[in-house]
């Protein structure tokens, strides 16, 4: 369910020259691994379910937190209640725990979005990750496990684009969208086709101004 990244190639715009990071020159281990998110989440959930010292309360959400010097009480949307000595807020960029604690954030928008999709291609990717720095932002081609696994015929794309153009691009039909992808992707992997839905995520900087409060930490 994973694909190793053996080499990384970085290029600037249309230049035919590239910077090559070769795993054989750094000890032989992969530079990293690509794991599709749903596989990673399932593995985490199964490990939590098997742990003797963890109680999984899901699906559920925290409706309200009450903190004092003695501990924390969490009221759940299901009506249940949990009490602990410490609450760890690991609930993402729109953290309810952080908001409830009144912890402010510093934010900066890059006026860019990341368009993400999976493509199937004709040729083997050889477990090489490519990153191209284009005027609108980076365009990354990341190797995924093939279908069948040894085929090396699937990659994840992360296409950085200006926010002003993102709605138009996401509104294209599949044929027109792939035509735009090919302009940036090239033809070194042969013919390409979409292998799943497209997603778009805003790109921004955000960090909490404090990481600790009474009986609370952010992770």
PLM segments and residue spans:
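A short, N-terminal amphipathic alpha-helix
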Residues: 1, 45-49, 124, 183-184
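A short, aromatic/hydrophobic, helix- or strand-capping loop or linear motif
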Residues: 1-3, 193
């Amino acid at each position: 369910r994973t694909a190793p990244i053996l080499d990384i190639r970085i290029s600037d715009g249309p230049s035919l020259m590239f910077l090559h990071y070769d795993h054989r020159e750094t000890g032989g281990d992969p530079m990293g691994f690509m794991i599709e998110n749903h596989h990673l989440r399932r593995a985490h959930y199964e490990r939590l379910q098997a742990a003797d010292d963890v109680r999984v309360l899901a699906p559920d959400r925290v409706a309200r937190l009450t903190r004092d010097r003695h501990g924390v009480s969490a009221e759940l949307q299901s009506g249940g209640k949990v009490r602990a000595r410490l609450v760890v807020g690991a609930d993402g960029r729109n953290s309810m725990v952080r908001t409830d604690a009144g912890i402010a954030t510093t934010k900066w928008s890059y006026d860019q979005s990341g368009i993400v999709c999976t493509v199937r291609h004709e040729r083997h990717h050889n477990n090489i990750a490519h990153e191209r720095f284009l005027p609108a932002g980076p365009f990354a081609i990341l190797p995924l496990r093939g279908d069948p696994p040894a085929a090396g015929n699937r990659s994840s794309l992360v296409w950085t684009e200006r926010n002003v153009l993102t709605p138009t691009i996401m509104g294209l039909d599949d044929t027109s969208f792939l035509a735009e992808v090919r302009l940036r992707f090239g033809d070194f992997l042969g013919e390409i086709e979409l292998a799943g839905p497209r997603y778009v995520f805003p790109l921004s900087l955000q960090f909490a101004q404090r990481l600790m409060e009474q009986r609370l930490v952010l992770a």
